[in-house]
UniProtKB/Swiss-Prot annotation:
EC class name: isomerase
Region (Disordered): 1-180
Gene name as annotated: top1
Name of the protein: DNA topoisomerase 1
UniProt feature, compositional bias: Basic residues: 13-22
Length: 814
């Protein structure tokens, strides 16, 4: 129950007239999703029933003939013309975003380890099936047609007719260039040179290690151990995580202990630490817990001062000067050392992430400008002046030897250009998609196994938005995509049902039971034939690289990821077209989230149910009850004012579900406590201000006791209401009460909609598809077209990232 509810009750009892305009209903911004049926954009068009096929369809592909191979090779090697989609931004009048007053703040198996294949284009045992030609089931598929070529600068074509460019700015405009630089209105978006001049201040390194107090030690076999600082730091990483699930994972423990001993040896530390089970990290753990509690209980002023000092130290690293403009830098902090967690069942979880030094880092900066200073006594690995890349610094991390970069922030011009090009590329696919689908459907019946596998993989990537997948090493997480599907990941159920069950990206389980095209089902059955067994690749003639190389021959820049972006944006566009008319704001947001959730399901963007989800649902239910209680009181006020309404409006006598006398007693106690809390907080705020001006003017405690009597009066009045079953309307007129009742009905509907949205979204994550796959112009145009504040659909982070899409007009078409 919020304090606003307490206000509502106390004001009516004290007979204070409610005045002013009605508050607008507010929905809490949510990046969560809601329920929707599965809707793959192609499932209807591609999974049509075909003619029944005889048993001879299961005959293996016969040995290919030379002439057939030649003909098909010629057909598949035809060049496709390049085209750029009619992208860009159209001008449209900006619709004002009405800020709304908050009426109510929202309370807010893995599959078993599989055998791996050492090579992507061969089965585990090395056996290769002969390439065979299948019985004739030809299809008059038309080869991919060439599409006319247009200019490579699509953004200019959709510029507003009166849009200004950097060439015709006034002096006043130039003063605001850093803040309002709209790169998307520029005529020149160069794919090669990314910048002309670049200045920055480098990166921030992790602070040096501070040794533990002398009385805090690692205990080994009952005895304290005096570790050298380097080893003590690593032991502390584990001790700080002692009560987490990670620290209880045997793989995590083994990897940590191995690297801990390695650091001990590197320090030439003479020790007898041999067994992890004899290590006791309790002292260290309690020390870190104490430090956490001290930080939590730190006075607000002290926290503010520490934050201010940190911000001042970091300020110069947050910005760079790009082509004379001040632009924000993204991840300018070098990740501190620690223990690698990894996602899912990662085999390297618990391994030591070592401290990064300047000698590992390459700096990229403009020529003729000061090079950032490294740490004292150190030097950069290399200083480059490469204006064809967008990173400011790079290095290799030690866990997986991955390359790490420092880029500009998500809302920067370079990042924005990259995003716009990505979404334009997916729009461009619209001009090719029909021919590409005809092509891969023809390949589904190809005489060549490699083409048949490629066509089947393209079908799965297109229809079910599967990732392409890459071959994994033994020391990498066992995650799978389309090209790396293994025998055990695909189960076939005649006549044409396929069950996919594997760990996808980030070790998130992908489970989907779907009906597929009969030819696809038949192909998968062929690809699983003996001698293939568990651990063997389904697509043993196909790799991600070869697939993407082939896709590039169909359309410049086309890859499996472009298909995901295309299908995500296409699905969202189609779902938004189903928008019913005359919806409330809350229902519009729910509709949008359900459309978004359809995309998230398509892309397998899942999440686990939060631990406090049930608690949140209970809070929602209680808040709805509190609003129903207010509605019941308003109805009683109306009946008290005009008793005859009991006959003409019998709905005023209707009981509110769940509002019993026992619940009301408990609720009255809650209102009483909230009123006291509100009075105390107001008293404390006043005293803080008075103390700052003149310590002698601070209000005495006796004043607080006087003020708290108002809460006691409220309690007495509420108890009297409960006994009499009547509520005094005070000075309120019938018209005012009716307005308040209508407002309250709307608030209850909003709260119920929020509750539905929250519950439907508990296992699906909206954020990933919003940030990476759905064209943001779809959301901006929807926002303007349906008068939904963009703040209800996009968080500030996403709005900053896609600032280039903010001018999208309401009639923009994907």
């Amino acid at each position: 129950m919020s304090s606003s509810d307490s206000d509502s009750v106390s004001l009516s009892i004290r007979r204070r007239q409610r005045r002013g305009s009605s508050k607008r209903i507010s929905m809490k911004e949510s990046d969560e999703e809601s329920d929707s049926s599965e809707n793959h954009p192609l499932s209807e068009s591609l999974n049509k029933k075909s003619k029944s096929e005889s048993d001879e369809d299961d005959i293996p592909i016969r040995k290919r003939r030379a002439s057939s191979k030649k003909n098909m090779s010629n057909s598949s090697s035809k060049k496709r013309a390049k085209v750029m989609g009619n992208g860009g931004l159209k001008n449209g009048k900006k619709t004002a975003v009405v800020k709304e007053e908050e009426d109510f703040n929202e309370i807010a198996k893995p599959s078993p380890k599989h055998k791996r294949v050492s090579k992507a284009n061969g089965s585990k045992n090395g056996a290769k099936s002969a390439v065979k030609k299948e019985e004739s089931d030809t299809d008059d598929s038309v080869p991919l047609r060439a599409v006319s070529t247009v200019s490579l600068t699509p953004y200019k074509s959709e510029l507003p007719s009166g849009a200004s460019t950097t060439q015709n700015r006034s002096p006043n405009d130039e003063e605001d260039e850093d803040e309002d630089y709209k790169w998307w209105t520029s005529e020149n978006i160069d794919d090669t040179q990314k910048w002309t001049t670049l200045e920055h201040n480098g990166v921030i390194f992790a602070p040096p290690y501070e040794p533990l107090p002398k009385n805090v030690k690692l205990i080994y076999d009952g005895n304290p151990v005096n570790l050298p600082p380097e080893a003590e730091e690593v032991a502390g990483f584990y001790a700080a995580m002692l009560e987490t699930d990670h620290a209880k994972n045997p793989v995590f423990q083994d990897n940590f202990f191995r690297d801990f001993l390695k650091v001990c040896d590197e320090c030439n530390f003479n020790h007898n630490i041999k067994e992890f089970s004899k290590c006791d990290f309790t002292q260290m753990f309690h020390h870190f817990e104490q430090k956490r509690e001290e930080k939590k209980s730190m006075p607000k002023e002290q926290k503010k001062a520490i934050k201010q000092k940190k911000d001042e130290e970091e300020e110069k690293y947050k910005w760079c000067i790009l082509d004379g403009r001040k632009e924000k830098v993204g991840n300018f902090r070098i990740e501190p050392p620690g223990l690698f967690r990894g996602r899912g069942s990662h085999p390297k979880t618990g391994s030591l992430k070592r401290r990064v030094y300047p000698e590992q880092i390459t700096i990229n900066i403009g020529e003729g400008v000061p090079v950032p200073e490294p740490l004292p006594g150190h030097q950069w690995a290399e200083v480059k002046h490469d204006n064809t890349v967008t990173w400011l610094a790079t290095w290799h991390e030690n866990i997986n030897n991955n390359v790490k970069y420092v880029f500009l922030a998500a809302g920067s011009s370079l990042k924005g250009q990259s995003d716009l090009k990505k979404y334009e590329k997916s729009r461009k696919l619209k001009d090719y998609i029909d021919d590409i689908r005809k092509g891969y459907r023809k390949d589904l019946k190809s005489e060549l196994t490699v083409e048949r596998q490629r066509g089947t993989a393209m079908y799965l990537i297109d229809v079910f938005a599967l990732r392409a997948g890459n071959e994994k090493g033994e020391d990498e997480a066992d995650t799978v995509g389309c090209c790396s599907l293994r025998y055990e990941h695909v189960t076939l159920k005649p006549p044409r049902t396929v069950v996919f069950d594997f760990l996808g990206k980030d070790s998130i389980r992908y489970y989907n039971e779907v009906e597929v095209d009969p030819q696809v089902f038949k192909n998968l059955k062929i690809f699983k034939r003996p001698p293939k067994k568990e651990g063997d690749l389904i697509f043993d003639r196909l790799s991600t690289n070869s697939l993407n190389k082939y896709l590039t021959s169909l359309m410049d820049g086309l890859s499996a990821k472009v298909f995901r972006t295309y299908n995500a944006s296409y699905t969202m566009a189609e779902e938004l077209k189903k928008m019913p008319k005359n919806l409330t704001l809350a229902d519009k947001i729910l509709f949008y989230n359900r459309a978004n959730r359809t995309v998230a399901i398509l892309c397998n963007h899942q999440r686990s149910v939060t631990k406090n989800h049930d608690v949140q649902m209970e809070r929602f239910a209680e808040r709805i009850k509190a609003l129903q209680y207010q509605r019941m009181r308003l109805r009683k006020m109306m009946l008290n004012l005009e008793p005859k309404l009991a006959k003409s409006k019998p709905e005023l006598l209707a009981k509110e579900e769940g509002i019993t006398d026992s619940w009301i007693v408990k609720h009255h106690e809650t209102l009483y406590e909230l009123e006291k809390e509100k009075i105390k907080k107001k008293f404390d705020r006043e005293n803080e201000k008075l103390a700052a001006e003149d310590p002698k003017s601070v209000l005495p405690e006796s004043e607080l006791e006087v003020r708290l009597k108002a809460a006691d009066e409220l309690k007495k009045a509420l108890d009297a209401e409960l006994k009499s079953k009547k509520v005094d309307p005070g000075r309120s007129s019938m018209e005012q009460l009716e307005k308040r009742l209508n407002k309250l009905n709307e608030r209850i509907n909003v709260m119920r909609t929020q509750m539905i949205d929250k519950d439907e979204n508990k296992t699906t994550a909206l954020g990933t598809s919003k940030i990476n796959y759905i064209d943001p112009r779809l959301t901006y145009s929807f926002s303007k077209r349906e008068d939904v504040p963009i703040e209800k659909l996009f968080s500030k982070t996403i709005r900053d990232k896609f600032n280039w899409a903010a001018d999208t007009p309401p009639d923009w078409k994907w």
